[in-house]
């Protein structure tokens, strides 16, 4: 399900812009995905030049990239808080900052890091902008619960699909050992209400709706970048 649209130049501009807001001494949440990767690489170069930061990765992939870039890391339980988290999104309503995440199956840890952060700065290219969220909502589910969860969301008007792995037989398994169920609700008119509804389903570890977490977003375009705050 992971979206790979958008130009590399646009993604790079967004990632670099967010990384440039990081100050010396900050604890920084490091998100997952192709656009956030540019932010991590930019921070790595800044660390080489003397910037003093600590990174808190949201996934195995983010951790490995940060290590490769020379960024000192700690786990979420090893810090008192996070000053700023930088992460991507699969869809974003620009007017409100409501977004959909989970194409990389890391949304459970991403939401944990976002909840611990004083600020969440999203980085996206302009292909991720939409007036209304309408992509399937990723649910991280306990392996034994996926059938029950699927039946429940069908009763709520969703069409669930267990996400299949691309390079192995069987389903995608998250870093935390959960499965991912992508649920198509069509156009989502009330994301906050849907988020509450999904959170109440037994067996759902986390959903990919981020309703009121975002404080800023940098939007990369082929010819520039713009930043909005919320």
What are these regions (language model features)?
Residues 1-91:
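N-terminal active-site beta-alpha-beta segment that forms phosphate/nucleotide-binding
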Residues 2, 60-230:
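Conserved phosphate- and dinucleotide-binding cores of soluble alpha/beta proteins
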């Amino acid at each position: 399900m992971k979206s790979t649209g958008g130009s590399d130049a646009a993604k790079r501009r967004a990632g670099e812009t967010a990384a440039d807001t990081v100050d010396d001494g900050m604890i920084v949440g490091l998100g997952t995905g192709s656009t956030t990767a540019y932010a991590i690489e930019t921070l790595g170069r800044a660390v080489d030049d003397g910037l003093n930061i600590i990174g808190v990765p949201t996934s195995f992939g983010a951790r490995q990239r940060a290590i490769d870039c020379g960024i000192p890391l700690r786990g979420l339980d090893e810090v008192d808080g996070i000053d700023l988290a930088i992460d991507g999104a699969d869809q974003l309503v620009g007017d409100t900052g409501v977004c959909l995440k989970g194409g990389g199956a890391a949304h459970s840890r991403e939401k944990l890091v976002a909840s611990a952060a004083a600020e969440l700065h999203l980085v996206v290219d302009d292909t991720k902008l939409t007036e209304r969220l309408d992509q399937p909502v990723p649910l991280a589910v306990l392996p034994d619960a996926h059938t029950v969860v699927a039946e429940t969301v069908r009763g709520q008007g969703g069409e669930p699909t267990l996400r299949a792995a691309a390079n192995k037989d069987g389903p995608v398994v998250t870093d935390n050992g959960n499965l991912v169920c992508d649920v198509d609700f069509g156009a989502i008119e009330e994301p906050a209400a849907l988020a509450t509804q999904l959170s109440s389903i037994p067996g759902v570890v986390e959903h990919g709706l981020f309703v009121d977490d975002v404080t800023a977003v940098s939007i990369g375009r082929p010819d520039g970048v713009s930043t909005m705050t919320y």
